[in-house]
């Protein structure tokens, strides 16, 4: 197609349908601005028949369903002809690099076979899928946010990294990714300063890393970054839109610019603004401060301990005051000068599933009960209670309609991590059976939609597709 991944090809006079012979095949390039595409086989005597022609009107039903153009024209430059004996095989290579010989093609194919994982059950499919998101770039490992739309996103990287890397035994690669993010935190890049919670997810990921390398290695390698990140909130280093107030809570507000993970924008306006004190941001903030204090005390950083020791209690007190909703057992989703927002969203469950939480056990039980009554589905947690008038049970229609539904109903998987952690924190091993049942609901998805992987989100109404 020789096009951008977000565009579709249409028949045009500018496309070059010519092909040029090379050893073992041909090279072609539809447009001058693109690299050459090398088409080769490992079978000597295979002939390429040049027959440039347009094929019109390929239909992509899913694209049409999603409100996009779903018809494409594709140009072929020709086809290969050869004769095969019974049982004989042929390997075809399409690459941006020319293969030096048929043996090179065979070697690359054999190496690819050797590196394949055996996808024989649900867990092995998940392990294989996790491998695909970890890529190598100059300077180390990196996590791709999703295929095929995005590159690396620091928030999504930090949330996914324990499962993608640590649980696969890829500890060194995990630390390479964290090193890159640590550098971004120290330099204050724009992609960090536009996300109120991302530096705080860094601390949560380090807590998972600690279980694999120990507290001393975490403090030695990242202690300076941890302290600097906290100071950037306190001292205004995150910019005027994101900062710690005198009450110990983190404030994040910018006109029509969403600063939390609920970051969809339609026609220049945030779908879920959540300006002010956001519940998961402050839960993560409290966890980050307490964790850094824990390590500072353990490894003798008296200066940091003296400067920050009184903050957790101040933050807990302010959280209890600002997030209290009269007559409701759960905390607010966010609070600012004009409202204490009582929408039931999955953000509150983050406050229950962290190592350090501002909620006592009775409060966590009430939050979990609320989550189970309003948000829990077989596929994850809804992004909004069905009883809310803004709720959308189907993620369908135009891009704008889907963006709205995505944060106002659609089910997300990742908050399940904190729901499960909170249940284990209260029930211990008594939750094992129920946790296994939650996981089993995803087994059938491995064979549909994203083959071998799970979907990012699901419809909020049954059958949760």
Q: What does each model-identified segment do?
A:
Residues 1-465:
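Acidic, mature catalytic/reactive cores of soluble proteins
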């Amino acid at each position: 197609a020789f096009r951008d991944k977000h565009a579709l090809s249409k028949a045009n006079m500018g496309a070059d349908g010519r092909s040029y012979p090379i050893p073992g095949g041909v090279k072609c390039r539809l447009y001058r601005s693109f690299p050459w595409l090398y088409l080769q086989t490992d079978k000597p005597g295979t002939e390429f028949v040049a027959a440039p022609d347009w094929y019109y009107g390929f239909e992509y039903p899913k694209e049409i369903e999603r409100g996009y153009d779903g018809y494409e024209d594709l140009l072929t430059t020709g086809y290969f002809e050869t004769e095969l004996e019974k049982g004989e095989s042929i390997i075809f290579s399409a690459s941006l690099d020319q293969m030096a010989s048929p043996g090179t093609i065979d070697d690359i194919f054999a190496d690819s076979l050797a590196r394949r994982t055996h996808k024989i059950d649900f867990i092995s499919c998940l392990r294989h899928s996790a491998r695909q998101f970890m890529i190598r770039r100059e300077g180390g490992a990196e996590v791709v946010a999703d295929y095929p739309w995005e590159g690396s996103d620091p928030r999504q990287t930090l949330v996914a990294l324990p499962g993608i890397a640590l649980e696969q035994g890829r500890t060194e690669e995990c630390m390479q990714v964290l090193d890159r993010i640590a550098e971004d935190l120290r330099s204050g890049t724009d992609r960090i300063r536009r996300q109120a919670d991302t530096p705080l997810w860094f601390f949560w990921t380090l807590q998972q890393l600690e279980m694999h390398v120990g507290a001393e290695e975490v403090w030695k390698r990242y202690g300076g970054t941890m302290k600097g990140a906290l100071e950037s909130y306190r001292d205004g280093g995150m910019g005027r839109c994101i900062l710690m107030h005198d009450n110990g809570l983190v404030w994040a507000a910018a006109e029509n610019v969403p600063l939390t993970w609920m970051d969809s924008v339609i026609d220049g306006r945030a779908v879920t603004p959540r300006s002010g004190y956001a519940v998961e941001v402050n839960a993560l903030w409290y966890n980050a401060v307490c964790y850094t204090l824990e390590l500072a005390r353990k490894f003798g950083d008296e200066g940091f301990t003296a400067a920050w020791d009184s903050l957790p209690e101040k933050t807990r007190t302010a959280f209890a005051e600002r997030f209290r909703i009269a007559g409701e057992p759960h905390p607010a989703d966010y609070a600012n000068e004009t409202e204490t927002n009582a929408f039931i969203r999955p953000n509150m469950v983050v406050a229950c599933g962290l190592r350090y939480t501002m909620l006592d056990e009775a409060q966590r039980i009430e939050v979990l009960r609320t989550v189970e009554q309003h948000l829990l589905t077989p596929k994850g947690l809804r992004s909004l209670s069905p009883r809310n008038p803004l709720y959308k049970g189907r993620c369908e229609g135009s891009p704008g309609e889907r963006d709205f539904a995505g944060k106002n109903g659609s089910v997300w998987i990742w908050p399940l991590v904190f729901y499960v952690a909170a249940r284990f924190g209260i029930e211990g091993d008594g939750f094992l059976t129920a946790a296994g049942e939650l996981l089993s609901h995803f087994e059938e998805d491995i064979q549909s939609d994203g083959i071998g992987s799970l979907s990012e989100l699901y419809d909020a109404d049954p059958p949760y597709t």
